[in-house]
Structures are given as structure tokens and as C-alpha cells.
Design a protein with these regions (language model features):
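C-terminal helical "tail/cap" subdomain of flavin- and related membrane-associated enzymes
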Residues: 309-402
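Glycine-rich FAD pyrophosphate-binding loop
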Residues: 8, 22-42
Length: 402
């Protein structure tokens, strides 16, 4: 029997959930407090996994004006070692950069073209009724909506979670990131994706992701600790853009655009609240980000699809919750644990240097490491036999038929 579902939040997780439920025959309404297009603090990078999921949702990359594929990656160790990591240049897309202002808007329009109702400028206000028979929600400009399930795709601070009394007091995320668009780029960053493992960022890193028209998305991600204050991170941000090995790849006359933005990164899928009654949490609301790289778009899409499938497959709210949690465990838990271990190891400079030296052993290690890093295979695939297959690190990328 079709369910009526309200999705709160029209980012990648919310739209993926909406598209999944609609395809399976359910009645879906999506609301978002913002009006699109709107910017979203993000590195804008899409891994192979995220690209394959978008393809599976029948999303057309040509909807994104500044969609930029990339096959050349350079990593630099704090020791000065540079490692060229070539992704396949044929056989589909393995990495892409898509500005979130454009990507999220395009996903909203993609859902609308499917016939899904999306209300912009309509913020969640409160839950007015919630029991075993249904849930009612008050939404700005729409009044009270009564549905079978609510899917909260409303971000790390999740007003829905807060309204249910499920927020963690003082939680600021596991990581913090800064980002700024930079124009007039004429160095190698114009075409190549750069990653810098700076000693004062470990286990984090700085990045430069190429965009059309001599622009890049430049930023860094850093583990949040008690000795890394906001002031420390602001000072670090200003210093990064003066380091010679970074300015060299941007070119002499690069121009930062507008102001930099910063955002917390939630990465605790192992103990985050996943559901409550008839409410499921997805994306950043369920803290699904990869704790090794900070990648979150692929994980957001996966949680959205998992929530939609759980609602479709089950007849009771209890079964929906259990099925959704099982799907999350199957999709993300082993990878999260692997990423957590690797992240802790990379905190130590001597270990980070050894790992990067190992990556640079030969062409085979470089080729396969970069495909693993960009989630061509799951993080913990070696330890999860159920995910083994004959085309290990040899599958085509996304959109290979185009």
C-alpha cells in the first residue's frame, strides 16, 4: 500500500529519497526552508560512487552548467614528495566537481520533472502529532501536513531531531572545513585536482578542485580537537594561501572570490540517532560523512535511497526503522570503521609519510590507490566478502555509455 511521506530538506539526500519513493509508487512531498539555487558550503567533489548513484537516479550531468570531470590528481606530502595519480580518462567518469549551488538546484528540478512536489521557502516548524498511526508536521507557509512518515534531510543541526529532544548537547562535528572559490587560476590547478597533506592539517588535508573558466574550489578539512580553536583555523586558512607550493599551482595572479565559508562535518554514523517513531534521519542529519576524506555526497545519496527503500519494503514503523538501520549498517558501517582507523593512523606524520611512500611504490599502487580513494570500491571492501566481485577496481566509471 502506498505511503504518504514528507521529506524535510531538498539537498542530495532528500532528493535521492524523493526520487526513490516516487519511482516505487509512493506519495511524496518535499519542503525546504531555502529557495533554489542556494549555495552550500562544500568541496563540490563527486567520487566514483556518488557519480554511479546519480547515474542510477537517471540524473543528467548536463543540467549542471559548471560540471567538471577530472582524471589528473596530484598529492603532495609535507615532505615535498609529489605523487601523480591518474584516474582513467576513458570508460566513464571517475571524479567530477559540481558546485553545490548548481548541483542541488539541478536535483530539485530533476525531481520536479519526475512529478514530485517540492515547496521552497517552507521551513519545518514543529511536530504537532506523532503516534503509531501517523505523524503531523507544521510547515511554514503550508500549515499542518499529516503523513505516514517523515524523512529528515535537514542537515547536521536537524531541527526535526531537535524537536524530538534527540540532539546531542554541544555537538560540533568530528571535522571542520573551510572553502573559497578562487578565480584567475593559471597554474596546474586549472586542470589537475590537487591534494596537500600538510603537517599541521593531519589527518586532514587541503585541496584545489578545478572548475571551468579558470576557477577552483579551494579549501581544507581538519579534525576538530580541543587545541584547534576557531581562531587557529582562521589563521591557518590565511596562511595556506601564502605557502609557495600552493600558490605555485594556482598561478601568480589568482583572485579569491567573495568570502570564505566554513562548516562542521558530522562523521559518526556508528552511533548517530537514525530514527524515532515515524521519523528517519538521512544525510548529515544521520552524520553519514566519511571520516577519512570528509566526502559526504555519496553517503547522503545512499542514506536517502536506503530510507526510501525501507519505507517501501515494510508495513510497520518498527519494521521500517529496523530495515533502515540494517541497510545503513550494510552500506556504511564497515567503511566508517575502516576510515576511522586510517584517520587515526594518519594523525602521526611518520605514518602519513610512510603511507604516501607506499602509495608511490609503482604504477600499480598509484593507479589502484586513487581509484580506491575516490570510492570506486567501498573503503572496507577487502574485509567485506559480500562486496567482492570479478571486476575489482576495473569497472567502468559512471555515464560510460554517454
Amino acid at each position: 500500500m502506498p505511503s504518504k511521506v514528507l521529506i524535510i530538506g531538498a539537498g542530495p539526500s532528500g532528493t535521492a529519497c524523493a526520487a526513490t519513493l516516487h519511482r516505487l509508487g509512493h506519495e511524496v512531498v518535499v519542503v525546504d526552508k531555502a529557495t533554489f539555487p542556494r549555495d552550500k558550503c562544500c568541496g563540490d567533489g563527486l567520487t566514483t560512487n556518488a557519480l554511479r548513484i546519480l547515474e542510477g537516479l537517471n540524473f543528467d550531468p548536463s543540467r549542471v552548467a559548471d560540471w567538471q570531470t577530472c582524471s589528473d590528481v596530484e598529492m603532495r606530502s609535507f615532505s615535498g614528495r609529489k605523487i601523480d595519480l591518474p584516474l582513467p580518462s576513458i570508460g566513464g567518469q571517475f571524479a567530477a566537481i559540481a558546485p553545490r549551488a548548481q548541483l542541488d538546484h539541478a536535483l530539485v528540478e530533476h525531481c520536479r520533472d519526475m512529478g514530485i512536489t517540492i515547496h521552497e521557502g517552507c521551513a519545518f516548524e514543529s511536530i504537532t502529532h506523532h503516534d503509531t498511526n501517523g505523524i503531523s508536521v507544521r510547515v511554514e507557509n503550508l500549515g499542518e501536513l499529516t503523513v505516514d512518515y517523515v524523512v529528515a534531510a535537514d542537515g547536521m543541526w536537524s531541527p526535526v531531531r531537535k524537536s524530538l529532544g534527540l540532539s546531542t548537547q554541544g555537538y560540533l562535528g568530528e571535522w571542520h572545513a573551510f572553502r573559497q572559490y578562487i578565480g584567475n587560476v593559471h597554474g596546474s590547478a586549472n586542470e589537475k585536482l590537487h591534494i596537500w597533506f600538510e603537517k599541521d592539517l593531519l589527518p586532514g588535508y587541503a585541496w584545489s578542485f578545478p572548475l571551468p573558466d579558470n576557477r577552483v574550489n579551494f579549501g581544507f578539512g581538519i579534525l576538530r580537537t580541543s587545541d584547534r580553536s576557531t581562531r587557529y583555523m582562521n589563521d591557518l586558512w590565511r596562511d595556506l594561501l601564502t605557502r609557495p607550493h600552493i600558490t605555485a599551482v594556482l598561478g601568480e595572479h589568482f583572485v579569491p572570490e567573495d568570502r570564505h565559508t566554513a562548516w562542521p562535518i558530522p562523521a559518526r554514523i556508528h552511533d548517530a540517532v537514525r530514527s524515532s517513531g515515524r521519523v528517519l534521519f538521512i544525510g548529515d542529519a544521520v552524520c553519514a560523512t566519511d571520516t577519512l576524506t570528509g566526502e559526504g555526497i555519496g553517503q547522503a545519496l545512499e542514506t536517502g535511497i536506503a530510507a526510501g527503500e525501507a519505507i517501501h519494503e515494510c508495513n510497520t514503523a518498527a519494521d521500517v526503522r529496523d530495515t533502515y538501520s540494517h541497510k545503513i549498517d550494510s552500506l556504511l558501517l564497515a567503511d566508517h570503521r575502516m576510515s576511522s582507523v586510517l584517520s587515526r593512523m594518519l594523525t602521526y606524520p611518520v605514518v602519513a609519510r610512510m603511507v604516501l611512500a607506499l602509495v608511490d611504490t609503482n604504477n600499480w599502487t598509484r593507479k589502484n590507490f586513487v581509484r580506491w580513494m575516490f570510492e570506486d570500491e567501498a573503503r572496507a571492501v577487502v574485509f567485506t566478502p559480500r562486496r567482492w566481485h570479478r571486476q575489482f577496481l576495473a569497472r567502468p566509471g559512471a555515464y560510460s555509455a554517454k
